[in-house]
């Protein structure tokens, strides 16, 4: 038996973020349509070549997306929201795709965006309408398959599976069972598979990550119906990732498919036992190389594990655990990483090399080459940069009292209301203000040593002063300093905490054109000196209004970084929590008495199986409270969350015991607030009243409409008024117009409430 290798997908953004730049140029009218298409074609060709040159046998196609692969599937199925379809003669084209993703006017809003399972990638949520007619409308998968075949590659097309697609979407309008749409979309899937079968391909990868979830019974049974219907078109490799599918094996093993892919990184399998449950004729694809982290793989360990089942399986593939979408592209692009640490890492291109080395070692039963690859892993175990005894000692000395505020919210709230004397429906923002070219240049010049500390501080303070001035002119109640010193909400803190390392080009896609460069946690974490105190203190000196300090929470820093794999996530989170606790207390000493600790990643850290939620939420909440609980009653703690559903973790959110929580709700039309109807959240809430991810300027009427919706769920005396998220990606004109309308809406609502009372 020859063992072949494959990846489940490759990063689509380009080595130098070419896709991001092309998207933004196209949206602004600075790039022609034909030239934009050429950028996409060039990126695909480069990706295929990189994988082939690294030794990948089956080259994936269909993993490229102009914005998001779930949105591409909606386009393929012709599942276009009516408000976007009627803009341009019902034409389903690239501009239609971008309208769905970004919106084009207040009346033609973007579709909702949310997290892709428990990752930091975001997808555009499909909208389902009972009466929508669906048909094969977007032939990107066929065109790109032909493109790769013409170049001589052994091609493996990738399609998001029908059940997972329906699971990820939401009903708009009249309620009906989403599974009723299965009979409408399966003929389209069948048509696509039949057309692919006419090409020179061995099999098609159909992604069904929903199989790792605790699905309702009828959804499990739907798999049988769907894949019986698709049987006979072409060979199907059913692909799962992010967790184990053992709990659903009885529904999977009878499916008429070519084989199954499992994630051996995040799924806890007894491989020998699991293999025995599968049909002998199936090909088994083992996801052994972590697609979501940057550490070099222990190929010797993997060789031994895979070798145990070789004689029991006639056909075997090895691959990445999931798409390499979540990994930076090429470690060789990093010129400033020190020699010691650089040997510890593996990015997408190197992960392809790992798959090639491992498949060759297994086929030859020879471990010489992989032993050499693993030598740096063993060296890391003895590095002084990893283990720090003083951090470990402090963590071991934590007491229960460190996780609790001294008094309840009701007592704190009375003291805070007396101290701050804010109006009903107080206005604030989430933290960041527009990151202008001047701000970016200032930071870049400082980082490159072109300006000194004094000039940098003068420049940053100038921008802070402008932000404070604009907020005062607008009449905002609680101000922020605007974060001009921060390139990214996680990277900035990582740069100022010990235990992190940074890349120059380790970009990964978060959504659309938004890319992030996560820091890497390489050792025990601690704070060496104050991080934000200087800037917040200066901002507060410019105004009599309260200024809110902005910190990124421990769970978000953890999950938006590439974490260590040698200790538990809980330990890392609590180390970060202790470091932030020091920062919070220093802010309080300097009379900064409203402090926001952002935790947008709280929900994405949830295990995909609900049976494991309580354990995770227990330590995640503890890490937050460790950072926030040391302050006085009069210091108001805020937290912010975005892009997520809250209804099933409301108890955990309440246990955070933040005085105020601000949340993303505008894009979902306040739908998330339904959670507050059944769960009486005890503290204050700022439901986002407009979507900052769209360039649309919200009207006063639309903001008041959303506030009235919020009042139906939350007592008005506990509501704050704020945008959905930070304003970093918006320009100043959009920001001023939107905030002006937000403040006007809040004032009009106050006047209305006064008249009623």
Swiss-Prot record:
Pathway annotation: Amino-acid biosynthesis; L-methionine biosynthesis via de novo pathway; L-methionine from L-homocysteine (MetE route): step 1/1
Binding site for L-methionine: 430-432, 483, 598
Active-site residues from the entry: 693
Catalytic activity line of the entry: 5-methyltetrahydropteroyltri-L-glutamate + L-homocysteine = tetrahydropteroyltri-L-glutamate + L-methionine
Required co-factors: Zn(2+)
Keywords annotated in UniProt: Amino-acid biosynthesis, Metal-binding, Methionine biosynthesis, Methyltransferase, Repeat, Transferase, Zinc
Coiled-coil portions: none
GO terms under biological process: methionine biosynthetic process; methylation
Cofactor: record remark: Binds 1 zinc ion per subunit.
Residues holding Zn(2+): 640, 642, 664, 725
Residue numbers binding 5-methyltetrahydropteroyltri-L-glutamate: 17-20, 115, 514-515, 560, 604
PANTHER family named among the record's database cross-references: 5-METHYLTETRAHYDROPTEROYLTRIGLUTAMATE--HOMOCYSTEINE METHYLTRANSFERASE
Function: Catalyzes the transfer of a methyl group from 5-methyltetrahydrofolate to homocysteine resulting in methionine formation.
Family, similarity comment: Belongs to the vitamin-B12 independent methionine synthase family.
Protein name: 5-methyltetrahydropteroyltriglutamate--homocysteine methyltransferase
Organism: Buchnera aphidicola subsp. Schizaphis graminum (strain Sg)
Taxonomy of the source species: Bacteria, Pseudomonadati, Pseudomonadota, Gammaproteobacteria, Enterobacterales
């Amino acid at each position: 038996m020859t063992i072949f290798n494959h990846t489940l997908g490759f990063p689509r953004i380009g080595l130098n973020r070419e896709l991001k730049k092309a998207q933004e140029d196209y949206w602004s009218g600075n790039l022609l349509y034909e030239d934009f298409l050429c950028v996409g074609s060039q990126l695909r060709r480069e990706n295929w070549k990189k994988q082939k040159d690294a030794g990948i046998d089956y080259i994936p196609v269909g993993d490229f997306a102009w914005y998001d692969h779930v949105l591409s599937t909606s386009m393929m199925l012709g599942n276009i929201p009516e408000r976007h379809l009627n803009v341009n003669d019902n034409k389903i084209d690239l501009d239609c795709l971008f309208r769905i993703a970004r919106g084009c006017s207040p009346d033609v809003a973007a579709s909702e965006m949310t997290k892709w399972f428990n990752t930091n990638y975001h997808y555009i949520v499909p909208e389902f309408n009972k009466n929508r007619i669906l048909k094969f409308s977007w032939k990107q998968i066929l065109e790109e398959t032909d493109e790769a075949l013409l170049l001589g590659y052994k091609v493996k097309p990738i399609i998001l599976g029908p059940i997972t697609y329906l699971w990820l979407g939401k009903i708009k309008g009249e309620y009906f069972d989403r599974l009723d749409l299965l009979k409408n979309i399966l003929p389209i899937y069948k048509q696509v598979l039949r057309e692919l079968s006419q090409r020179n391909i061995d099999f098609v990868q159909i992604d069904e990550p929903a199989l790792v979830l605790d699905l309702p019974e009828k959804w499990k049974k739907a798999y049988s119906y769907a894949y019986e219907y698709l049987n006979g078109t072409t060979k199907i490799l059913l692909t799962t990732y992010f967790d184990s599918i053992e709990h659903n094996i009885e529904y999977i093993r009878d499916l008429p498919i070519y084989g199954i892919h499992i994630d051996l990184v995040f799924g806890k399998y007894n491989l020998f036992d699991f293999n025995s449950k599968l049909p002998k004729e199936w090909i088994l694809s083992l996801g052994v190389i972590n697609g979501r982290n940057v550490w070099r793989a222990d190929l010797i360990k993997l060789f031994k594990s895979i070798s145990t089942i070789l004689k029991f399986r006639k056909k075997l593939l090895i691959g990445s655990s999931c798409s390499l979408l979540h990994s930076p592209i090429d470690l060789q692009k990093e010129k400033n990483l020190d020699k010691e640490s650089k040997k510890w890492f593996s990015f997408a291109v190197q992960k392809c090399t790992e798959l090639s080395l491992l498949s060759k070692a297994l086929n030859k039963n020879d471990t010489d080459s992989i032993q050499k690859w693993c030598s740096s892993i063993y060296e890391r175990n003895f590095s002084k940069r990893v283990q720090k005894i003083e951090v470990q000692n402090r963590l071991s000395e934590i007491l229960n009292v460190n996780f609790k505020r001294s008094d309840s919210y009701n007592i704190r709230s009375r003291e805070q209301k007396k101290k701050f004397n804010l109006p009903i429906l107080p206005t604030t923002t989430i933290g960041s203000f527009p990151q202008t070219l001047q701000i970016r240049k200032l930071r870049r010049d400082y980082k490159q040593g072109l300006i000194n500390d004094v000039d940098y501080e003068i420049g940053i303070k100038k921008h802070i002063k402008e932000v404070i001035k604009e907020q005062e002119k607008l009449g905002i109640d609680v101000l922020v300093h605007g974060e001009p010193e921060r390139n990214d909400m996680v990277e900035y803190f990582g740069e100022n905490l010990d235990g992190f390392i940074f890349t120059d080009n380790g970009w990964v896609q978060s959504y659309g054109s938004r890319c992030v460069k996560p820091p890497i946690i390489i050792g025990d974490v601690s704070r060496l000196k104050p991080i934000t105190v200087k800037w917040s203190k200066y901002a507060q000196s410019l105004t009599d209004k309260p200024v809110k300090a902005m910190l990124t929470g421990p769970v978000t820093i953890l999950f938006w970084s590439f974490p260590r794999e040698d200790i538990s996530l809980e330990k890392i989170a609590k180390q970060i929590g202790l470091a932030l606790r020091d920062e919070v207390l220093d802010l309080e000493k300097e009379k900064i008495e409203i402090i926001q600790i952002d935790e947008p990643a709280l929900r994405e850290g949830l295990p995909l199986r609900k049976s494991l939620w309580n354990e995770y939420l227990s330590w995640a909440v503890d890490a937050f409270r460790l950072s926030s609980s040391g302050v006085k009653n009069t210091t108001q703690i805020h937290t912010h969350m975005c892009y997520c559903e809250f209804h099933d973790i409301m108890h955990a959110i309440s246990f955070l015991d933040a005085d105020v929580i601000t949340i993303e709700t505008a894009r979902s039309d306040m739908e998330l607030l339904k959670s507050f109807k059944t769960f009486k959240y005890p503290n204050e809430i700022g439901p986002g009243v407009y979507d900052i991810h769209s360039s649309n300027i919200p009207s006063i009427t639309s903001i008041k409409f959303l506030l009235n919706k919020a009042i139906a769920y939350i007592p008005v005396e506990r509501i704050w008024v704020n945008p959905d998220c930070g304003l970093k990606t918006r320009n100043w004109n959009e920001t001023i117009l939107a905030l002006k309308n937000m403040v006007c809406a809040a004032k009009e609502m106050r006047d209305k409430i006064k008249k009623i009372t």
